[in-house]
A protein has these predicted regions:
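Hot-dog-fold acyl-thioester-processing enzymes
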Residues: 2-67
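Hydrophobic beta-strand-centered segment that forms part of the acyl-chain substrate-binding groove
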Residues: 47-97
């Protein structure tokens, strides 16, 4: 199966730091896939809050996550701090990509 490639924007409009806790670690002693999604969800909440929104109210609409994709660049371990950067793109009548 070919690896996915996510085209990243040249510039991100938001950045946040999240600590990797012991409950984020799997049996391989590094960040678990499901924990990554949880951390990205927390970053999304922070991003929306920085713009004055919540997941339940972005200009009167609630957020629905329809797709999730990850392209791993390195492992993450307990005690490290992950920097998650976000930008919004591909706006359409159904939403956008974050």
């Amino acid at each position: 199966m070919p690896r996915i490639k996510i085209d990243l924007p040249e510039r991100f409009i938001f950045s946040t730091e999240l600590a990797i806790y012991v409950n984020h670690i799997n049996y391989g002693n590094h960040l678990d896939n499901s924990a990554l999604i949880s951390l990205v969800s927390e970053a999304r909440v922070r991003f929306l809050k920085s713009l004055g929104y919540t997941e339940m109210n972005v200009e009167g609409y609630g957020i629905i996550v329809a797709d999730v994709a990850a392209q791993y660049r390195s492992e993450a371990f307990h005690g490290e701090v992950m920097v998650i950067e976000m930008a919004a793109d591909d706006f359409n009548k159904y939403g956008c990509d974050l």
